[in-house]
Swiss-Prot record:
Molecular function (Gene Ontology), one example: aspartic-type endopeptidase activity
Catalytic reaction(s) noted: Release of signal peptides from bacterial membrane prolipoproteins. Hydrolyzes -Xaa-Yaa-Zaa-|-(S,diacylglyceryl)Cys-, in which Xaa is hydrophobic (preferably Leu), and Yaa (Ala or Ser) and Zaa (Gly or Ala) have small, neutral side chains
Keywords: Aspartyl protease, Cell inner membrane, Cell membrane, Hydrolase, Membrane, Protease, Transmembrane, Transmembrane helix
Family in the record: Belongs to the peptidase A8 family.
The organism of origin for this protein: Shewanella baltica (strain OS195)
Phosphoprotein recorded as keyword: no
Upper classification of the organism: Bacteria, Pseudomonadati, Pseudomonadota, Gammaproteobacteria, Alteromonadales
Pfam families documented for this protein: Peptidase_A8
Biological role: This protein specifically catalyzes the removal of signal peptides from prolipoproteins.
Domain of life according to the entry: Bacteria
Name of protein: Lipoprotein signal peptidase
Leading EC class: hydrolase
Length: 171
Protein backbone atom coordinates (compact mmCIF):
# COMPACT_ATOMS: atom_id res chain seq x y z
CA UNK A 1 0.00 0.00 0.00
CA UNK A 2 1.45 3.42 -0.95
CA UNK A 3 2.27 5.91 1.77
CA UNK A 4 -0.37 8.55 2.48
CA UNK A 5 0.66 12.19 2.69
CA UNK A 6 0.59 11.89 6.51
CA UNK A 7 2.93 8.90 6.47
CA UNK A 8 5.23 10.14 3.71
CA UNK A 9 7.79 12.90 3.55
CA UNK A 10 5.08 15.14 2.07
CA UNK A 11 4.03 15.69 5.67
CA UNK A 12 7.06 18.03 5.88
CA UNK A 13 6.09 20.10 2.81
CA UNK A 14 5.05 22.93 5.13
CA UNK A 15 8.78 23.69 5.51
CA UNK A 16 9.03 24.37 1.76
CA UNK A 17 5.97 26.62 1.97
CA UNK A 18 7.43 28.50 4.95
CA UNK A 19 10.78 29.01 3.20
CA UNK A 20 9.04 30.13 0.01
CA UNK A 21 6.88 32.74 1.76
CA UNK A 22 9.70 34.01 4.01
CA UNK A 23 11.89 34.39 0.93
CA UNK A 24 9.25 36.14 -1.17
CA UNK A 25 8.15 38.48 1.64
CA UNK A 26 11.74 39.48 2.39
CA UNK A 27 12.42 40.18 -1.29
CA UNK A 28 9.22 42.23 -1.63
CA UNK A 29 10.31 44.26 1.39
CA UNK A 30 13.70 44.91 -0.25
CA UNK A 31 12.09 45.91 -3.57
CA UNK A 32 9.70 48.28 -1.78
CA UNK A 33 12.32 49.92 0.44
CA UNK A 34 15.66 49.93 -1.40
CA UNK A 35 17.01 51.36 -4.61
CA UNK A 36 19.36 49.12 -6.59
CA UNK A 37 22.73 48.89 -4.74
CA UNK A 38 21.38 50.80 -1.73
CA UNK A 39 22.70 49.48 1.60
CA UNK A 40 21.51 49.51 5.18
CA UNK A 41 24.34 48.82 7.63
CA UNK A 42 23.11 46.58 10.44
CA UNK A 43 26.36 45.37 12.04
CA UNK A 44 30.06 46.13 11.46
CA UNK A 45 30.19 43.08 9.17
CA UNK A 46 26.62 42.85 7.85
CA UNK A 47 24.44 44.91 5.51
CA UNK A 48 21.20 44.60 3.65
CA UNK A 49 22.22 45.59 0.12
CA UNK A 50 19.85 45.27 -2.83
CA UNK A 51 21.52 43.62 -5.82
CA UNK A 52 20.20 41.77 -8.84
CA UNK A 53 21.58 38.36 -9.69
CA UNK A 54 21.02 37.29 -13.29
CA UNK A 55 22.93 34.04 -12.76
CA UNK A 56 23.04 31.28 -10.18
CA UNK A 57 24.93 31.04 -6.90
CA UNK A 58 27.83 33.49 -6.71
CA UNK A 59 26.49 35.09 -9.92
CA UNK A 60 27.57 32.06 -11.96
CA UNK A 61 26.67 32.71 -15.64
CA UNK A 62 25.23 36.13 -14.77
CA UNK A 63 26.59 37.72 -17.95
CA UNK A 64 25.72 34.82 -20.28
CA UNK A 65 23.22 36.79 -22.34
CA UNK A 66 19.83 35.74 -20.98
CA UNK A 67 19.54 32.06 -21.92
CA UNK A 68 20.63 31.09 -18.40
CA UNK A 69 17.30 32.36 -17.04
CA UNK A 70 15.53 29.51 -18.82
CA UNK A 71 18.19 26.94 -17.93
CA UNK A 72 17.86 27.78 -14.22
CA UNK A 73 14.06 27.74 -14.55
CA UNK A 74 14.16 24.21 -15.98
CA UNK A 75 16.64 23.09 -13.30
CA UNK A 76 14.47 24.54 -10.49
CA UNK A 77 11.29 22.92 -11.80
CA UNK A 78 13.08 19.62 -12.42
CA UNK A 79 14.73 19.40 -9.00
CA UNK A 80 11.58 20.52 -7.19
CA UNK A 81 9.54 17.88 -9.00
CA UNK A 82 12.11 15.14 -8.40
CA UNK A 83 12.44 15.97 -4.69
CA UNK A 84 8.65 16.08 -4.29
CA UNK A 85 8.39 12.60 -5.84
CA UNK A 86 11.09 11.38 -3.44
CA UNK A 87 9.26 12.95 -0.50
CA UNK A 88 6.13 11.08 -1.54
CA UNK A 89 8.02 7.78 -1.49
CA UNK A 90 9.85 8.11 1.82
CA UNK A 91 8.69 7.85 5.39
CA UNK A 92 7.73 10.97 7.34
CA UNK A 93 10.07 9.73 10.09
CA UNK A 94 13.20 10.55 8.04
CA UNK A 95 13.61 14.00 9.56
CA UNK A 96 17.01 14.94 8.11
CA UNK A 97 16.21 14.04 4.50
CA UNK A 98 12.66 15.39 4.57
CA UNK A 99 13.93 18.67 6.01
CA UNK A 100 16.73 18.78 3.43
CA UNK A 101 14.42 18.17 0.49
CA UNK A 102 11.83 20.68 1.62
CA UNK A 103 14.48 23.36 2.23
CA UNK A 104 15.80 22.87 -1.31
CA UNK A 105 12.29 22.87 -2.79
CA UNK A 106 11.26 26.06 -0.97
CA UNK A 107 14.47 27.82 -1.97
CA UNK A 108 14.35 26.67 -5.59
CA UNK A 109 10.74 27.81 -5.98
CA UNK A 110 11.47 31.14 -4.28
CA UNK A 111 14.25 31.94 -6.75
CA UNK A 112 12.18 30.53 -9.62
CA UNK A 113 9.41 33.07 -8.97
CA UNK A 114 12.00 35.88 -9.05
CA UNK A 115 13.41 34.69 -12.38
CA UNK A 116 9.97 34.44 -13.94
CA UNK A 117 8.65 37.74 -12.54
CA UNK A 118 11.74 39.94 -12.81
CA UNK A 119 14.26 38.14 -15.00
CA UNK A 120 16.70 38.15 -12.06
CA UNK A 121 16.91 37.04 -8.45
CA UNK A 122 16.75 39.64 -5.68
CA UNK A 123 19.74 39.26 -3.33
CA UNK A 124 20.28 41.41 -0.26
CA UNK A 125 22.09 39.60 2.56
CA UNK A 126 25.61 41.06 2.50
CA UNK A 127 28.38 39.87 4.83
CA UNK A 128 31.74 41.61 4.61
CA UNK A 129 35.05 42.19 6.32
CA UNK A 130 36.80 45.51 5.70
CA UNK A 131 36.35 45.97 1.94
CA UNK A 132 35.93 42.29 1.09
CA UNK A 133 32.31 41.28 0.54
CA UNK A 134 30.95 37.75 0.37
CA UNK A 135 28.55 37.49 -2.60
CA UNK A 136 25.10 38.76 -1.61
CA UNK A 137 22.42 36.11 -1.20
CA UNK A 138 18.85 35.65 0.05
CA UNK A 139 16.72 33.36 2.20
CA UNK A 140 16.12 30.95 -0.70
CA UNK A 141 19.87 30.59 -1.29
CA UNK A 142 20.41 29.90 2.41
CA UNK A 143 17.70 27.22 2.43
CA UNK A 144 19.16 25.53 -0.66
CA UNK A 145 22.66 25.49 0.88
CA UNK A 146 21.45 24.15 4.23
CA UNK A 147 19.39 21.50 2.44
CA UNK A 148 22.37 20.48 0.31
CA UNK A 149 24.59 20.18 3.41
CA UNK A 150 21.97 17.97 5.09
CA UNK A 151 21.78 15.74 2.00
CA UNK A 152 25.58 15.41 1.90
CA UNK A 153 25.67 14.77 5.64
CA UNK A 154 23.12 12.01 5.26
CA UNK A 155 24.86 10.46 2.26
CA UNK A 156 28.51 10.64 3.33
CA UNK A 157 29.10 11.67 6.92
CA UNK A 158 26.61 9.68 8.93
CA UNK A 159 28.01 6.32 7.85
CA UNK A 160 24.59 4.80 7.30
CA UNK A 161 22.05 6.83 5.37
CA UNK A 162 18.59 7.29 6.84
CA UNK A 163 17.27 5.87 3.58
CA UNK A 164 19.12 2.60 4.20
CA UNK A 165 16.65 1.62 6.89
CA UNK A 166 14.08 -0.94 5.81
CA UNK A 167 11.13 1.29 6.70
CA UNK A 168 12.71 4.43 5.22
CA UNK A 169 11.65 4.21 1.60
CA UNK A 170 8.49 2.71 0.21
CA UNK A 171 9.35 0.93 -3.03
Amino acid sequence: MPLTWKDSGLRWYWVAVLVFFADQLSKQWVLANFDLHESLNLLPFFNFTYVRNYGAAFSFLSDAGGWQRWLFTIVAVGFSTLLTVWLRKQSASLLKLNLAYTLVIGGALGNLVDRLMHGFVVDFIDFFWAKSHYPAFNIADSAICIGAVLIIWDAFLSGKSETDSAEGVKK
